[in-house]
A protein has these predicted regions:
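Residue-level recognition of oxygen-bearing side chains
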Residues: 53, 80, 109
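Second-shell residues forming the walls of enzyme active-site clefts
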Residues: 64, 77-85
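Structural preference for beta-strand elements that scaffold enzyme active sites
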Residues: 42-44, 63-66, 97-99, 120-122
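Conserved, mostly hydrophobic/aromatic
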Residues: 35, 57, 65, 113, ...
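Conserved functional loop/turn residues at catalytic and ligand-binding sites
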Residues: 61, 69, 117
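Active-site entrance/lid segments in N-terminal catalytic domains of soluble metabolic enzymes
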Residues: 1-55, 59, 71-74, 83, ...
Length: 175
């Protein structure tokens, strides 16, 4: 971002207008089948909140499933993404890549997502706010803060390897 500026998707014309009041149901299952057949690159589908949809996407050949409520800014009544994450993970093959991004505010939120089955956790607003406030140094500080928060929370959880986190780490083992 700092080196090349804001990304500009090449498949959108700069004058393209989107009417947010019109239905956008053009990307149905048949469209995705055709897209997968035509597209040889990686296919990541974002906005998945239903385990049945995730399973269908896996069967259609999606390379990754991106669990996201889009910051919960577009549809307040959608299922809570972090509550759906473990359900989606359990419906998929272990080899299917699962990405998560909603509601990440600190290192503990990252750990919750990893324990719930995410392979990758994205941090959007935090990174943008950090860059806006302090430029590159803000991004470095944000990254260092998240790392420290993760280390502290893992110690509290009794977890020693971030690659071995699982749902059991979210439950207290003390009686």
């Amino acid at each position: 971002l700092l080196m090349n500026g804001v990304p500009r998707p090449q498949n959108f014309d700069k004058d393209m207008k989107i009417d947010r009041n019109k239905p956008r149901g053009a990307a149905d299952w048949e469209f995705l089948k055709k897209l997968r057949a035509l597209w040889r690159g990686k296919l990541i589908i974002k906005g998945v909140l239903n385990p049945k949809d995730a399973l269908k996407l896996e069967r259609l050949g999606a390379d990754a499933i991106y669990v996201s409520g889009h910051g919960s800014r577009q549809f307040d009544s959608c299922p809570i993404p972090i509550h759906q994450l473990a359900k989606i993970r359990s419906s998929l093959k272990k080899s299917t890549v699962l990405i998560y991004d909603t509601g990440i505010r600190n290192g503990e939120d990252i750990l919750k997502a990893l324990c719930s089955g995410a392979d990758f956790v994205m941090v959007g607003k935090q990174a943008l706010f950090s860059i806006a406030a302090e430029g590159f140094e803000g991004l470095v500080q944000m990254t260092n803060n998240l790392k420290k928060e993760i280390e502290i929370a893992m110690a509290q959880m009794g977890a020693f390897d971030i690659n071995r986190l699982n749902a059991g780490h979210l439950e207290s083992t003390l009686t």
